[in-house]
C-alpha cells in the first residue's frame, strides 16, 4: 500500500451530499467575492466514497416530491442572487416558465436530485469521488492543534494524506433496521427500493410484499409497489392505528427557520426535549396527507370491486422472520390480542427510517479528544465546531449529527444554505484572528496560507 502526502487545504470536507455540497457552493461564492478585494480565497477539497454524486437514489420514485419548499435549496436562503439556486437551475435547463406554470413549491424528488447533480458538476474541481476518509489526526504544536491530517483511501489501494486547517464531516444518514434484521436479496431497506425492484425482472411475478413502517418512506413504498405490481398483494404493517399526517402548518414550520436554531441551541436541555417532542410530527413517522388519502382511496375502491390487494395491518408488528428458498416468511402479531398471522411473501421491505451516521467513525483515535455532554452526546458549538480537549487554531466541524444541539432541522434540507454560510464565516473569522495574532515568545507563528504544507516535524496525537 502506497502512502503519499499531497498539498494542504484551508478546508477538507468528508462526504459530498447536500450538506457539504451547500458548503462547497458557499466557499465558491465566498472566493468570488474576496477575489476582487485582493484577499486570499479559501482552498478546499471534498472527499466522497461513492463513485458519483447521488441523493436518495433508491427512492427517486415517480411523482414523489420533496417535503420542503424549493427555496430551501443550496443557496437561496443565504444568497437569493446565487447562480447555484434552484431557480438558476431551472433557467439553465429551460424550464423556468414551465415550473412557474406548475404552481407548486415542492418539486419532484427526481428533479431536485438532478438539481443537486447539476450543482455538483459545476463544482467537480472541488471533489474527489471514490475516496473514503479513514482517519483525521490532529497536528499539535506547542500543545495547540494547528491543523489536521486527513487520511484518504482510494480503490487503487493508494492512501493519500492531506493537511487541512478545517475539516467538515458531513457523514449523512444511514438506513436503520430493527435489531436482529439483516439485509438480503429478500429483506430490503426502502433506501434501496428501485435497484432491488429492477433485480426482480425476469423472475416469476411477485405474489406478495410486506412493507414495515408508518412514515413517509413506508407509505411511498406501499403506493409504489401497488402501482408497479398491480396483481401482487401488498401488506402494510405498522404499530400505529393508522398513518399519521405530517404537521406542515405555517406556525409549526417556523421550527425550521434559521433563527429557530439560535433559539433551540441556547435553550435549557429540558426545553430542548420539550420542543423536540412537541414537533416530532413534522418529520418522524408521519406521512403527507395527500398520500394518506390516496392510499385510503385505494383500499376503499378495492373493497368496492371485491379485489383487495392492499392490506393494512395496523396495530401490528413483525415478531419473527425466516427466509425461504424463494422468499421470506413473516410472522405478524396483532398487538391488541396477540394473534399471529403468517405471511408467505416474496420480499419484505423495512421502511424504518434513517439514523445520523456516527461522525467519529472517521476520526480514528482522535475521537477520544471529543468532549461529550452528560448524555454521552458530542459537545458541539453553535457554529457546528466540535469541542475538543486540546485547544486549537484549527477547526473540526460536524453537520447532520447535531439534532440534540441545533434542533430538528439538523438532518434536513431546511438550513443547508444558511448553515454553509455560518461554517464559512466561522472559518474565515478564525483565519482573520490568526492573522492578527502575534506569536508569544518561543512559539512558532501560525500564518494562514492558501496551501498548508505538510510539516514532518510536527508532533501528531497518538
What are the residue ranges of the model-derived segments?
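Catalytic cores of transferase enzymes with a strong primary signal for eukaryotic protein kinases
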Residues: 21, 27, 59-66, 71-78, ...
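Tryptophan-centered motif/residue detector
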Residues: 55, 86-89, 118
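Residue-level signal for pocket-adjacent positions within structured domains
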Residues: 63-72, 81, 188, 313, ...
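Glycine-rich phosphate-binding loop and adjoining beta1-alpha1-beta2 segment
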Residues: 54-70, 253-257, 287
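Flavin (FAD/FMN) cofactor-binding and adjacent substrate-gating region
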Residues: 65-98, 263-271
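Flavin (primarily FAD) cofactor-binding/catalytic cores of flavoenzymes
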Residues: 1-51, 99-216, 220-462
Amino acid at each position: 500500500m502506497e502512502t503519499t502526502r499531497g498539498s494542504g487545504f484551508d478546508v477538507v470536507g468528508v462526504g459530498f451530499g447536500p450538506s457539504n455540497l451547500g458548503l462547497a457552493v458557499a466557499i465558491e461564492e465566498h472566493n468570488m467575492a474576496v477575489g476582487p478585494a485582493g484577499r486570499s480565497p479559501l482552498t478546499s477539497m471534498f472527499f466522497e466514497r461513492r463513485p458519483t454524486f447521488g441523493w436518495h437514489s433508491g427512492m427517486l420514485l415517480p411523482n414523489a416530491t420533496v417535503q420542503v419548499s424549493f427555496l430551501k435549496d443550496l443557496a437561496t436562503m443565504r444568497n437569493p442572487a446565487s447562480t447555484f439556486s434552484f431557480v438558476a437551475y431551472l433557467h439553465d435547463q429551460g424550464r423556468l416558465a414551465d415550473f412557474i406554470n406548475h404552481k407548486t413549491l415542492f418539486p419532484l424528488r427526481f428533479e431536485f436530485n438532478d438539481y443537486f447533480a447539476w450543482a455538483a458538476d459545476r463544482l467537480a474541481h472541488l471533489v474527489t469521488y471514490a475516496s473514503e476518509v479513514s482517519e483525521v489526526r490532529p497536528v499539535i504544536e506547542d500543545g495547540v492543534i494547528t491543523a489536521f491530517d486527513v487520511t484518504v483511501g482510494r480503490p487503487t489501494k493508494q492512501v493519500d494524506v492531506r493537511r487541512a486547517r478545517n475539516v467538515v464531516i458531513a457523514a449523512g444518514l444511514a438506513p436503520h433496521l430493527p435489531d436482529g434484521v439483516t439485509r438480503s436479496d429478500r429483506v430490503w431497506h426502502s433506501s434501496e427500493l428501485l435497484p432491488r425492484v429492477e433485480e426482480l425482472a425476469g423472475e416469476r411475478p411477485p405474489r406478495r410484499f410486506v412493507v414495515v413502517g408508518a412514515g413517509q418512506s413506508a407509505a411511498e413504498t406501499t403506493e409504489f409497489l401497488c402501482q408497479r405490481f398491480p396483481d401482487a398483494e401488498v401488506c402494510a404493517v405498522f404499530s400505529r392505528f393508522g398513518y399519521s399526517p405530517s404537521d406542515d402548518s405555517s406556525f409549526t414550520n417556523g421550527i425550521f427557520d434559521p433563527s429557530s436554531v439560535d433559539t433551540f441551541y441556547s435553550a435549557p436541555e429540558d426545553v430542548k426535549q420539550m420542543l423536540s417532542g412537541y414537533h416530532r410530527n413534522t418529520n418522524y413517522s408521519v406521512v403527507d396527507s395527500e398520500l394518506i388519502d390516496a392510499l385510503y382511496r385505494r383500499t376503499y375502491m378495492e373493497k368496492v370491486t371485491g379485489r383487495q390487494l392492499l392490506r393494512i395491518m395496523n396495530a401490528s408488528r413483525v415478531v419473527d422472520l425466516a427466509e425461504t428458498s424463494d422468499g421470506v416468511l413473516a410472522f405478524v402479531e396483532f398487538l391488541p390480542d396477540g394473534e399471529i398471522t403468517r405471511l408467505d411473501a416474496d420480499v419484505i421491505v423495512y421502511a424504518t427510517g434513517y439514523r445520523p451516521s456516527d461522525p467519529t467513525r472517521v476520526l480514528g483515535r482522535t475521537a477520544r479528544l471529543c468532549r461529550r455532554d452528560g448524555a454521552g452526546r458530542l459537545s458541539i458549538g453553535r457554529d457546528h465546531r466540535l469541542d475538543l480537549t486540546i485547544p486549537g487554531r484549527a477547526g473540526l466541524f460536524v453537520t447532520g449529527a447535531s439534532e440534540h444541539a441545533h434542533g430538528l432541522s439538523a438532518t434536513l434540507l431546511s438550513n443547508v444554505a444558511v448553515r454553509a454560510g455560518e461554517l464559512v464565516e466561522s472559518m474565515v473569522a478564525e483565519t482573520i484572528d490568526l492573522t492578527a495574532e502575534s506569536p508569544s515568545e518561543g512559539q512558532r507563528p501560525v500564518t494562514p496560507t492558501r496551501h498548508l504544507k505538510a510539516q514532518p516535524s510536527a508532533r501528531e496525537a497518538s
